[in-house]
């Protein structure tokens, strides 16, 4: 199964403000605080309820569950209720690190990101669908962009991973994070574009906050592949 990968600009402080603190409110039965926070950010009622539902799922997470598959994934979903996020098909830092572990230097493990202690084990990377990947801290975002500009080896490695014209989408996400002084969180299946029926594309977050560049690129590629397959089957 392929991966729908998304990149979410978010700072550790925002993780605390939008997820970890509201998570405690939900555990204490104070869901009105969550809805008040959503209202402060101008969130529509439909998405405010989705936001609350994600936090309720987070509050039900058990200690043995992987952080990446639970809180990490929910963090990415929550970010998309507040800010723009970015999509690429099948390309991820987690996969690049599997091939070339040296690139882990651009990432920070969850134990160095979360403001609170969690008993959940963490893999610090994509392990399957519906999962958080790595987190690039704000300073690491800046460093990667600098190295991308001046180091041909870094650019070559990233072009191979984000092939098919996808690298500009990643760069757009990195640049947005740098300009906003945020880090960048990777996740899978937060958004799932439907190449056959684009209007039936799904997102666990706010679909309209997904930057369209990567989605259009995937849809165009998928339709070309479908047309080619149909032509070859004649």
Provide a role label for each language-model segment.
Residues 1-234:
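Acidic (Asp/Glu-rich) sequence patches and key acidic residues
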